[in-house]
Amino acid sequence: TEYLYEAAHQSLLSTEKFMLDGRHTGTGGGNHMVLGGATPADSPFLRRPDLLASLIAYWHNHPSLSYLFSGLFIGPTSQAPRVDEARNDQVYELEIAFAELQRQIDRLGGVGGVNVQPWLIDRILRNILIDVTGNTHRAEFCIDKLYSPDGPTGRLGLLELRGFEMPPHARMSLVQQLLLRALIAKFWKTPYTTRLTRWGTELHDRFLLGTFVQMDFDDVLGDLREAGFGFEPQWFAPHFSFRFPLVGELHAGGISLTVSGALEPWNVMGEEGGAGSTVRYVDSSVERLEVRVLGLNDNRHVVTVNGIPLPLQPTGRVGEYVAGVRFRAWAQSSALHPTIGVQAPLTIDLVDTWTGRALGGCQYHVAHPGGRSYETFPVNAYEAESRRRARFFTTGHTPGPMHVQVLERSLEFPFTLDLRRY
């Protein structure tokens, strides 16, 4: 892996990419992990069909594994949707498939039995590991090349994990590979049979915020340490900084407020006529931020965004609260709710309800605050950082007396303030 990254560098190719506004993003190329053996007979997933079931179930119960290493395009219509993002009843059907797989394994010789047909796992899971359109390739766990009886190219004993994006550094890729090897070794020894969680709307609410992804991923590392694999959280700190970049910080009245990037699923729009064909656009006009507050007195202080109170949720640590902000950042010609205008810049106020005034605040702009339009992409990380810093100010809070509205927490997304509803 390090050789490939170095060879790309020597060929004047870069593994880093920056958007016009300076955001650090993936290069667009897939970093799909392909697992298998030298021959189909050596594939661990054909020798132990329960191993794939363990991986799928563990990924399902730990959404951080799906979202920490993925690209910008996530959600039901992405290139690698989770099983429970495809259809509402897929988790129920997946449990039936796991039970049937185990029944067939027990009938044909038990775990590791030589009498288990190699095509068995393909037939049982093929119609579960799909996207909303039934595409078997566009799935988080792609088994097209595992052992499909349809043709020789499908009988290679290979499992493709598509929920990985190329990281900017070789060692970030290496630690991903190490994580996969450790999980496979763990489940080879002890199959994962825990009941599948019904995440519901929580999947696209709580687990799109970096704080809760970090908590869930810490549980994963804890499981690996109990199994004898000494993983340290610091090894994955670059991944969290890459996926949930720091936007800015504010300190006022003994309270610390941190704004970070968050994940946002992109929706595919309905069909429209294109140049000689039919096209379906992707709505990337909505963005999401995470606001984390430390030292807050929930009886006294309220955090508002454009005058709307945030539905802050406790993290389990005293005085620490987190919430997400979802807002229309860009005006696209094809988007959900096209009549809703751009809601940027965001003004985040830390309000003292006892005095009725803001202790301080900050502003976040999605583009240059002076209205300048960048014509070229950043040439390096320094220029990209300067563009990011130019869009956040620790000034500009709402002056004068403030009347805070009554907090209306969403029933479907209690961790998120969706400004499109206001």
What are these model-derived regions, one by one?
Residues G30-L35:
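A short beta-strand motif that forms the metal-chelation/ATP-contact edge
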Residues T1-T27, A38-Y422:
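C-terminal accessory/tail domains of diverse enzymes
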